[in-house]
Amino acid sequence: MSIGLVGRKVGMTRIFTENGASVPVTVLEMSNNRVTQVRTPENDGYSAVQVAYGSRRNSRVNKSEAGHYAKAGVDAGELLREFRVAADVAAQYQPGAAVSVEVFQAGQKVDVTGVTQGKGFAGTIKRHNFKSQRASHGNSRSHNVPGSIGMAQDPGRVFPGKRMSGHMGAVSCTKQNLEVVRVDAERGLVLLKGAVPGSKGGHVVVRPAVKGGA
């Protein structure tokens, strides 16, 4: 399995296949990925490649981070991510090396992780797809309430994990087995079939699919 890349969601559009079918795609900008560290079983107990994305002013980087980037010989990034790989794959990379979007190929399946769009405080119907209660026939002012949230004196508490009203969205989410439709190495763009989590401009992490094959 190859390493993944970090990028930014540009937005959605569509492209047309040779037979005229319309395919909705999400455009990801994934240029300027560079290796900051290579983990080895001898030094770290596992094999991995650490990648930085984007740029950050030196005044916004603390001393430990600045030293980490300086050791790798790369500019400070806005995001660091680590990808577990086999030892022979990790040996192919050196700190400071650039990583191109060509690690992905058209037709490949990938997993995409991002932070979902925040929806603010939401009730149980919108947040958990609860059903509304009766509109009339004995129901008064209890149309959209969740109903009972527990039992009586025993156990005398609400169980953890009970689905209730609360903040909706703004959580990490992974969509699996999205197809790579096109790779534009010149502009550092990757086009994926369908939607990915997050708002326009949000960070995303793209890895080879762990379940869906090549």
Curated annotation (Swiss-Prot):
InterPro entries: Ribosomal_uL3, Ribosomal_uL3_bac/org-type, Ribosomal_uL3_CS, Transl_B-barrel_sf
N5-methylglutamine PTM positions: 153
Domain of life the protein comes from: Bacteria
Entry's Gene Ontology BP terms: translation
Chain segments carrying region Disordered: 131-153
Post-translational modifications reported in the UniProt record: Methylated by PrmB.
Entry GO CC: cytosolic large ribosomal subunit
One Pfam family per UniProt: Ribosomal_L3
Keywords: Methylation, Ribonucleoprotein, Ribosomal protein, RNA-binding, rRNA-binding
GO molecular function, one term: rRNA binding
Biased composition (Polar residues): 132-145
Function, as annotated: One of the primary rRNA binding proteins, it binds directly near the 3'-end of the 23S rRNA, where it nucleates assembly of the 50S subunit.
Subunit structure: Part of the 50S ribosomal subunit. Forms a cluster with proteins L14 and L19.
HAMAP family: Ribosomal_uL3_B
UniProt family annotation: Belongs to the universal ribosomal protein uL3 family.
Protein name: Large ribosomal subunit protein uL3
Source species of the chain: Thiobacillus denitrificans (strain ATCC 25259 / T1)
